Each structure stands twice: as structure tokens, then as C-alpha cells.
From Swiss-Prot:
GO terms, biological process: hydrogen peroxide catabolic process; response to oxidative stress
Keywords noted in UniProt: Calcium, Disulfide bond, Glycoprotein, Heme, Hydrogen peroxide, Iron, Metal-binding, Oxidoreductase, Peroxidase
Name of this chain's protein: Peroxidase 2
Cysteine pairs bridged by disulfides in the record: C31-C59
Family to which this protein belongs: Belongs to the peroxidase family. Classical plant (class III) peroxidase subfamily.
Organism field: Hordeum vulgare
Chain sites annotated for binding heme b: H24
Any one GO molecular function term: lactoperoxidase activity
Superkingdom to which the source organism belongs: Eukaryota
Binding-site positions, Ca(2+): T25, D73, T76, D81
Family matches, as InterPro entries: Haem_peroxidase (IPR002016), Haem_peroxidase_sf (IPR010255), Peroxidase_pln (IPR000823), Peroxidases_heam-ligand_BS (IPR019793)
Amino acid sequence: STLISSFANRSLDVADLVSLSGAHTFGVAHCPAFEDRSSRVRHNPAIDGKFATALRNKCSGDNPSGTLTQKLDVRTPDVFDNKYYFDLIARQGLFKSDQGLIDHPTTKRMATRFSLNQGAFFEQFARSMTKMSNMDILTGTKGEIRNNCAVPNRRVRTSRPPSPARGDRR
């Protein structure tokens, strides 16, 4: 419910939440980000036992600075598809927030639908991405279109034009 209200505060609805979470069909997470899912709890019905054991085995021991990672989608980690939702139904969601989609009555129906109908997932994902891409657009000097999203573009001075090169007759 916290995610539902967080999304609602940004004018995004439950369909947006469930479909945009499907982006977790790609990518990895560092072990510390999901250690709450793989902790040594005797029986945690919120996670598949074998999956929890595999996560625990992978992330325990020598893990300097949390460098070990786990793929977010255990079935098809390098394909954009609806198998992420199968992971959730099988109780193999890496994050609590992901697994919560199949456990919460408001989101369960849509997550299940996306597991059964990849086309419906793709259509809603496209609508939700478009909706999200139009939110809080920064223009002018407040924003920039980056060449590399992780690195701010180099700032260029525009206060005065560059001086002409020697021999240039402007």
C-alpha cells in the first residue's frame, strides 16, 4: 500500500505500478539490497524455500563491499518479457516490494494477468512509460538531455563567443 500511495502522489495508478515494476525483468541487485529476503528465517511463506537458500548461499561468506549480484528475473534475465510475473507467482521475487505485487489484493489480479498475457503487459508498460516520461520535465537551464545518463554533460560557457583563431578574418 505504501507503493500504491507513492505512485498515486505522482499521478500514477495501480496499472502503472504493476507494469513499471515489470522492468525488473532486466538487471541485477547487489546482495545487501535483498538480504531481508534471504535471511535465515526457518520458514518464511513469503519466499520460496529453495530460492531463499540459493540467495543465502550466493550472498553469504566473502562478499567484499556487497559486490556480489543476483539477476532480478530468474527465468529469462536477459529478455524483456513477462516471466518476472511468473517469478512472483512462484514466490521468487527478489525484493519485498516486487513480491508484494502478488500478495496485495489490489495488485494481484493485474500481476497475474500480466503473467498470462505478455501482450497486455507490453501495452500497459508502453502506456505507463510514456506517462512517466512526461512527468516533471525540466527545461532550459534547469535540466539537460544527457549523453550518458549517469554523467552530467560538460558545462560550456556561453557568456562570450570564442575569440577567432589567428589568421581568421571574420
